[in-house]
């Protein structure tokens, strides 16, 4: 997976912040791979050799290894990047991440059988999406309310990818406000061509 390396100073400042290990969570590392286990699951993340990960006294700290010859700004970016990724894993396995999506449109429906999700979105055929086993999914359709789908997982990156995939089935459109939206999301509306011509 590709990551955007951003602003050395800010990312390095983030990298200096220690991570507290919550009760019920364990962290280990082997061969540049950090593994985090907790009540919500287990996640692993490769860490670039230029970053040293120290686990001690219920704290995880990150430091730049000066023995590795790297571009200075890239090192600083790595410093903050991997600290953020490991912190996301700690939060994920201890608390989990949840997103709720709302289907806005006449006749739109969503249902699931286990992790197989079926969407009816105004096309001539339904859309099926098989979610990974480490993901929990719940769908709800109530009278006079838009159908919703709620997704929970320990993996923040995976959650983002799944939500992006689902939204791509019916991207929010700015004229009628229809589409698949995050719960509470407000679509910035535009005037149609006929209205703009008046």
Region spans (language model):
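N-terminal intrinsically disordered, cationic/polar leader segments
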Residues: 9-91, 95-164, 168, 173-198
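Short, Lys/Arg-enriched N-terminal segments with co-localized hydrophobic residues
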Residues: 1-10
């Amino acid at each position: 997976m590709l990551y955007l390396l951003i602003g050395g100073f800010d990312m390095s400042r983030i990298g200096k912040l220690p991570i507290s290990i919550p009760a019920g969570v364990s962290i280990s590392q082997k061969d540049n791979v950090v593994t985090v286990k907790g009540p919500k699951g287990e996640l692993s993340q490769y860490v670039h050799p230029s970053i040293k990960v120290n686990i001690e006294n219920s704290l995880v700290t990150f430091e730049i290894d000066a023995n590795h010859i790297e571009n200075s700004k890239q090192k600083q970016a790595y410093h903050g990047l991997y600290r953020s990724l490991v912190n996301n894993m700690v939060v994920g396995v201890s608390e989990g991440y949840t997103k709720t999506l709302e289907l806005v449109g006449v006749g739109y429906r969503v249902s699931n059988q286990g992790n197989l999700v079926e969407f009816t979105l105004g096309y001539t055929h339904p859309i099926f999406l098989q979610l990974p086993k480490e993901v929990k999914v719940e769908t709800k359709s109530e009278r006079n309310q838009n159908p919703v789908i709620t997704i929970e997982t320990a993996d923040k990156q995976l959650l983002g990818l799944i939500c992006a995939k689902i939204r791509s089935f019916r991207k929010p459109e700015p004229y009628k406000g229809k589409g698949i939206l995050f719960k509470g999301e407000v679509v910035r509306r535009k005037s149609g061509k006929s209205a703009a011509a008046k």
